[in-house]
Structures are given as structure tokens and as C-alpha cells.
Amino acid sequence: MRSSIGARRALFDCQSMLAIIGGSGLTRLSTLAVAHREVVRTPYGEPSSALLFGQISGRDVVFLARHGHGHTIPPHRVNYRANLWALKNRGVGTILAVASVGGIAPAYRPGDLVLPHQLLDYTSGRETTFFDGSDRVVIHVDFTEPYSLALRVHCLAAATAGGIPLRDGGVYAAVSGPRLETAAEIDRLERDGATMVGMTGMPEAALARELGVDYAAIAVVVNQAAGRGASAHAISMASIAEVLETAMDQVRALIDQVVERVP
């Protein structure tokens, strides 16, 4: 066990690659010239999908489909630890994640892209840390700012350069899912300060921090949250699918711009 830990740490010494974690609506990157794919075995089981290695604009990029390539894994069953460990183990030092959210803030509209700066965690029943007492000394990582400021700056610059509307800042409330929320639950989240609600933001962000990986997320508003606006009485899954299909064009364009700017 000790020798495997040493080898693992050696692999983690040099991290330079950029990874994209695709969520609902983003199961592939059309501009990624895939060189090879690899199913990585981890101490935490198998990741959600094979890692796709390739290049975008001459830059090495890895892609992972959070819900599997057929979108078969619900948010509460995603193996977040395996996903993050696999990426780190293969040389990833920066992760840009994409996730769909419900808009709580009145200004948010379906199709908006938001770059959250804070989060609230309401999830339960998930493996939330690598420091589980099995073979690693516990480290209490600082999580004051859950998203990488440097990566957020690159995302904002990329959006400006590409003429892509991107809202700067927001508070992501992570819930367990897979069901959507009640109107009363959204009322509570709003009182707590949340501006959007999603199901995959945690423990993904915290695990990235534990591994020393820069992490930021692009949140795609796919509907107004329960009890709000067009979702006052019910949420239309057909409408969500339509929004995702349209919004992903902008997401892909933004990713291409970010790839050109991340060191």
C-alpha cells in the first residue's frame, strides 16, 4: 500500500493539463481532436466515463462525461472521487466543469451562462472527501473561496473576447436530486443566499480543492426554479431539453476561448 501511495504522489508532482467535465447536454466536445481514450482504474472505483485525451487549438485537453456518455448516471450516483482522482492521476491541474442549474435569482433566464463564485452544500449520502482515514493524513483544506479566482478571470476574459454573455458571480446551491425541488425548498435556498440550484456542484469542487486542482464551473440556467416565473406551477422537461440544446453552442464556444487563455 505504501509503495502505491508513493507512486500516486509522484504522478501528482507535475500537473499542467486542462480537463473539461461535461454535464447534462455536454457529453462530447466537437472541437476536441481525440487522440486516445482511457478507462482509468482508481482506488475509488471506476470514473463515470473513459477519459478522452486530445487537443483543442493545439492545447492538450482531457474530457470526462460526468453522467456517462449515455447520460445514465444520476447526480447522487456519480463517483465524484473516482472522477477527480482519475483526472489528477493523468496530469490534470485545471478543471472547468459544466453544469445545468435552475435559476433562483429573478434576473436569471433560461439560456443564461453564469460563473458562480460561491456555493452552499445541501447534499447528503455522498462520499465527500479523500481524507477518509484509510491511508492519508487528514488535511483540513481551506474552502473560503470554492472556485479558482485565476480560472474565473480567464473565463471572463474568454467570454469578453468571444462576445459570449457570461454572468459574473452567483451562489450555487448543491442539492442531492435527482428529483427537482419544491417551491418551498427554493424559498429556503433563496433566503440562504442562493441564486441558482444544481445537483453536481458538490462534492466535486471540494474534492478538486483537496487534490490541489484549480476548479471553476460554468452554470447553464435551463429553467426558472420551482415556484418562479414560468415554473410557478410546474417545470417543463421538454423546455429544459430545448434550452440545453441551444445553450451548449455557446458553452462550446466559451470553452474553446478558455482553452486558448489558460496557461
Give the predicted meaning of each segment:
Residues 71-76, 173-176, 193-194:
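Short, flexible loop segments at the rims of nucleotide/cofactor-binding pockets, characterized by
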Residues 112-117, 214-217, 233-236:
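Short, hinge-like loop/turn segments at secondary-structure boundaries
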Residues 1-16:
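N-terminal amphipathic/basic-hydrophobic helices that include classical n-h-c signal peptides
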Residues 60, 93-94, 165, 195, ...:
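Residue-level detector of anion-binding/catalytic polar loops
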Residues 12-144:
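Metabolite-binding pocket within alpha/beta catalytic cores that recognizes anionic/polar moieties
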Residues 145-191:
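Active-site rim beta-loop-alpha module in soluble metabolic enzymes
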